[in-house]
């Protein structure tokens, strides 16, 4: 295709065309003249005029066929844009008119009642096929719900938090202390240790150890006291003035009953029975008691070699059976502890050495029995080690013939009551044991054997008597009958003992060396003989020591040395808070605000939280009953019950208030009894470590670190109602819409005659509902500035049926149609008196004893006018509009809704559906236009759906891409057309 002519060429061409036209019609000009004229025109200098330039511009725009087609395409595009713009403008004008039309008015507080008769058939006995309808009246009661909100009882109290306090506590469990208080045997001790280990190990298996920023309790005085008291409360070290042992191998203690099983009265087992020498009838030939037992007599007691060592310089004992009258077993354990601590404070002066007045007179010439009592005659029966190791002198109580030179012939002289006892019948009226010796003398000690028998020979001791007199000496000591009693004093060792308290040593040394180091050293000191003294029975916990070092050496090592450096390192690295988070353990619910753990801003709590009395507590303090009055197995059962309950409570993160003094807490917080009930109920606990501090076959010790989080209430709301927002249905512009009012409250509270509307923030459920913030708000529709409430509209499909069974036996119904004469669109509470079917569901009657609630919340009356296109608004985009009780201010809401709707692109999605939607919206406003739009929409979606509908729909979804491509092509076309315009360069 040839390019367009230049301006000079076009002017010449234009003149030549005009010359040809003029010469064709002329007959006077010859052909030669015509050629001459054309040559002149071609050679003529051309000066284009403005008119020529304009005409040349039009020529260049349409010089070729492609340029003509481009102009035609541009005109078509512009025409389409104009037509579509006009259509959109008309549609938006109509849309604006539809928006400005006011919609329906929702008015609540309407009560309806209906009775209808569903037919039920009944057979007649004469004919099985014949059935007659029998009317049965079913009553349906319907009550509309104000503002589409139902209020159901909220049984849980709502607690408003004033603050949260964090308290820590260490619980110590030592089975040996428990066993000693309950006087358990070794077998029962082992069972108790197994029970404690089982419960604590099961707790430890489900708890992880970590650290919380509360400070180490081992640095606190209360922890040191409790730990030392638990381990060494009744442990003392006695230092002889000069080492000296028991003088003989024998021990005469006829005041003690003998062991064995005897008919009639039986005595409680005595500790001294372990040292009893039984008289055997048969012995090997030439057997001699002196060769085996030394000076100890058969039928009496001997002193073991382990106790009768000459080089013993100290005695270590752990027993509370040496205390004087101030320590009463009828007192509670806490009272005795308080008395003991006061005694030790008064009887020591900055060291573990007791003052002389604390000792009995037997131990010191300055003794006044301030702490310990005198050893009596019967103590040797139950505490033989005490007498052997600690007596400075011993008074033997003997009924043996020959002691004190007493013989049968001298009884009348020695015992006035026995005068003439063997010379007349006076003995017939006296006790059978009266005026007799327990053991009688024989001529000599010998064995008599049969010929050839060497192993089993009859043995005749030097002193002998019948075993039936096993309680002879005890009855004589009780003065039940006259008897020739010989009492001889034996000097054992010198007075002026020095006594040291291991509890005081532990408490004082811990301040210097640390509790762990001191416990380690003192426990080793108790285990000096290979068996811990504090694990022995109270009556037998006395051992002799040879020049022990006291106080023991305390190695200058760190605390982690004894608590395992590896374990401490692991606690600080692996089990820290970051590790817990990575493992999935969240402490958010347990330790909410670490800064509140030590809340000492309150003057009433400054001393309490720092010096928390129950920061450290032992299991013995927390038991409900005094186990010292229980039998062995009953005490174990009682403690097992407590431990199991404690473990269960800790697993549920609750607090076992048996282990914490609520009276102290109530006094510090100055709360009433009812408030303390709430505090106890919602308090939470957290176990942050469980560790075993000691273990042996018969004893075990555990520690449990507890963190308590106490929520202090500011106010407690009772008698509450919960909000169930069911909403309302609206049918408008061909669209079913679910409308709900967003009330500013969730709870209605009724206290006395005052009704409060509560908005809850930052709440959590822990038996009760605990909220950090509770705001009292105003309900909707009370014509105040703060009562405007947002309304939410949601497009739903028909048919819409929502039935919610209520706890009182009624049903909450919201439906778009009517059934059983239940009105549509209005939320209603429906109650029936017989089972019936509505909306395809069975409605059943409530319980017979059901009664209507006495209190029903009342709300201000509210008439709500909605926009005409509320359904379409909700379908296109969820709009939040505020609703007030006045009709004038709703116009402002409609204006805001109109502005929002006009901003929307109404051509998105399916074009036929949108046109039909516009027709439905226009139906009530402009019926003719609505019919036309409906016809267009039906045509596009019906007959021409395959062509236009789908195409338009696809174009609608691809509109952004198509518009972009179209704009690019249009720009290219415009630039092309502009390039055709002749410029100065082209014109030249």
UniProtKB/Swiss-Prot annotation:
Ranges in the topological domain labelled Lumenal: 89-960
Motif Endoplasmic reticulum retention signal location, chain numbering: 984-986
Record: glycosylation sites: 109, 141, 183, 286, 311, 346, 391, 405, 423, 527, 556, 782, 808, 833
Post-translational modification: Envelope glycoproteins are synthesized as an inactive precursor that is processed by host furin or a furin-like proprotein convertase (PC)-mediated cleavage proteolysis to yield a functional heterooligomeric complex. Further proteolytically processed through regulated intramembrane proteolysis either by SPPL2A and SPPL2B or by SPPL3 in a PC-mediated cleavage-dependent or -independent manner, respectively.
Keyword check for Ribonucleoprotein: no
Subunit details: The mature envelope protein consists of a trimer of SU-TM heterodimers. The N-terminus of leader peptide specifically interacts with Gag protein. This specific interaction between Gag protein and Env glycoprotein may allow particle egress.
Name this protein carries in UniProt: Envelope glycoprotein gp130
Species whose genome carries this gene: Simian foamy virus (isolate chimpanzee)
């Amino acid at each position: 295709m040839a390019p367009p002519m230049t301006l000079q060429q076009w002017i010449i061409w234009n003149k030549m065309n005009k010359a040809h036209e003029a010469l064709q019609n002329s007959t006077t000009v010859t052909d030669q003249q015509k050629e001459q004229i054309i040559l002149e025109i071609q050679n003529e200098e051309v000066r284009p005029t403005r008119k020529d330039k304009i005409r040349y511009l039009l020529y260049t725009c349409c010089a070729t066929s492609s340029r003509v087609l481009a102009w035609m395409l541009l005109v078509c595009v512009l025409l389409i844009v104009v037509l579509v713009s006009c259509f959109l403008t008309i549609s938006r004008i109509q849309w604006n008119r539809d928006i400005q039309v006011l919609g329906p008015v929702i008015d609540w507080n309407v009560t309806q009642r209906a009775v209808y008769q569903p037919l039920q058939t009944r057979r007649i006995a004469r004919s099985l096929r014949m059935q007659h309808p029998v009317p049965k009246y079913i009553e349906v009661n319907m009550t509309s719900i104000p503002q589409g909100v139902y209020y159901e009882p909220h049984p849980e109290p709502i607690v408003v938090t004033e603050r949260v306090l964090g308290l820590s506590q260490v619980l110590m469990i030592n089975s040996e202390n428990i066993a000693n208080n309950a006087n358990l045997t070794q077998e029962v001790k082992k069972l108790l240790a197994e029970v404690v280990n089982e419960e604590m190990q099961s707790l430890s298996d489900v708890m992880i150890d970590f650290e919380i920023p509360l400070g180490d309790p081992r640095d606190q005085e209360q922890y040191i006291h409790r730990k030392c008291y638990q381990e060494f409360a009744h442990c003392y070290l006695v230092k002889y003035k000069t080492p000296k042992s028991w003088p003989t191998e024998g021990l005469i203690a006829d005041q003690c009953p003998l062991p064995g099983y005897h008919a009639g009265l039986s005595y409680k087992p005595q500790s001294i029975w372990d040292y009893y020498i039984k008289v055997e009838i048969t012995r090997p030939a030439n057997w001699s008691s002196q060769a085996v037992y030394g000076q100890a007599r058969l039928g009496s007691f001997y002193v073991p070699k382990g106790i009768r060592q000459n080089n013993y310089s100290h005695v270590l004992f752990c027993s509370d059976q040496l205390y004087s009258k101030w320590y009463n077993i009828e007192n509670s354990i806490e009272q005795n502890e308080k008395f003991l601590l006061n005694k030790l404070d008064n009887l020591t002066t900055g060291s573990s050495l007791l003052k002389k007045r604390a000792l009995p007179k037997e131990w010191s010439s300055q003794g006044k029995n301030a702490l310990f009592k005198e050893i009596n005659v019967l103590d040797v029966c139950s505490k033989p080690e005490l007498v052997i190791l600690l007596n400075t002198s011993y008074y033997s109580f003997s009924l043996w013939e020959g002691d004190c030179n007493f013989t049968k012939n001298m009884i009348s002289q020695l015992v006035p009551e026995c005068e003439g006892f063997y010379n007349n019948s006076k003995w017939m009226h006296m006790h059978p044991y009266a005026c007799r010796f327990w053991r009688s003398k024989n001529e000599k000690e010998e064995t008599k054997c049969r010929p050839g028998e060497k192993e089993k020979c009859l043995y005749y001791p030097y002193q002998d008597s019948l075993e039936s007199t096993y309680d002879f000496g005890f009855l004589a000591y009780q003065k039940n009958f006259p008897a020739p009693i010989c009492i001889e004093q034996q000097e054992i060792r010198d007075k002026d003992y020095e006594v040291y308290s291991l509890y005081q040593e532990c408490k004082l040394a811990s301040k210097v060396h640390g509790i762990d180091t001191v416990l380690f050293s003192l426990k080793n000191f108790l285990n000096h003989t290979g068996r811990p003294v504090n694990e022995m029975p109270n009556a037998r916990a006395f051992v002799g020591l040879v020049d022990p070092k006291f106080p023991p050496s305390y190695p200058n090592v760190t605390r982690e040395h004894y608590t395992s450096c590896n374990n401490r390192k692991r606690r600080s690295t692996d089990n820290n808070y970051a590790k817990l988070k990575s493992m999935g353990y969240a402490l958010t619910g347990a330790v909410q605000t670490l800064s509140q753990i030590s809340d000492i801003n309150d003057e009433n709590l400054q001393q309490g939280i720092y010096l928390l009395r129950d920061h450290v507590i032992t299991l013995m303090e927390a038991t409900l009953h005094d186990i010292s009055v229980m039998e062995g197995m009953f005490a174990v059962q009682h403690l097992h019950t407590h431990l199991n309950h404690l473990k269960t409570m800790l697993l549920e993160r609750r607090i076992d208030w048996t282990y914490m003094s609520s009276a102290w807490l109530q006094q510090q917080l100055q709360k009433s009894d009812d408030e303390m009930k709430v505090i106890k109920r919602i308090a939470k606990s957290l176990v942050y470590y469980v560790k075993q501090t000691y273990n042996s076959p018969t004893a075990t010790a555990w520690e449990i670190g507890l963190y308590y989080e106490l929520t202090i209430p500011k106010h407690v709301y009772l008698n509450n109602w919960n909000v169930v927002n069911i909403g309302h249905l609206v049918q408008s512009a061909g669209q079913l819409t679910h409308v709900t009012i967003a009330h500013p409250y969730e709870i209605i509270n009724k206290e006395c005659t005052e009704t409060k509307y509560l908005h809850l923030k930052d709440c959590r459920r822990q038996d009760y509902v605990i909220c950090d913030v509770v705001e009292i708000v105003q309900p909707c529709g009370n014509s105040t500035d703060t009562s405007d409430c947002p309304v939410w509209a949601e497009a739903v499909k028909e048919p819409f049926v929502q039935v919610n069974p209520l706890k009182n036996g009624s049903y909450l119904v919201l439906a778009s149609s009517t059934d059983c004469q239940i009105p549509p669109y209005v939320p209603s509470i429906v109650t029936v008196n017989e089972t019936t079917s509505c909306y395809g569901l069975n409605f059943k009657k409530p319980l017979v004893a059901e009664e209507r609630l006495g209190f029903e919340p009342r709300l201000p009356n509210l008439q709500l006018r909605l926009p005409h296109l509320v359904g379409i608004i909700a379908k296109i985009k969820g709009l939040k509009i505020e609703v007030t009780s006045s009709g004038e201010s709703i116009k402002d809401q409609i204006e805001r809704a109109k502005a929002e709707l006009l901003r929307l692109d109404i051509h998105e999605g399916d074009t036929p559906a949108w046109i039909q939607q516009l027709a439905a919206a226009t139906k009530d406003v402009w019926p003719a236009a609505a019919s036309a739009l409906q016809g267009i929409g039906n045509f596009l979606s019906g007959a021409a759906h395959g062509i236009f509908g789908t195409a338009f729909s696809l174009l609608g979804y691809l509109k952004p891409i198509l518009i972009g491509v179209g704009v690019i092509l249009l720009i290219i076309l415009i630039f092309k057309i502009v390039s055709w315009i002749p410029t100065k360069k082209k014109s030249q």
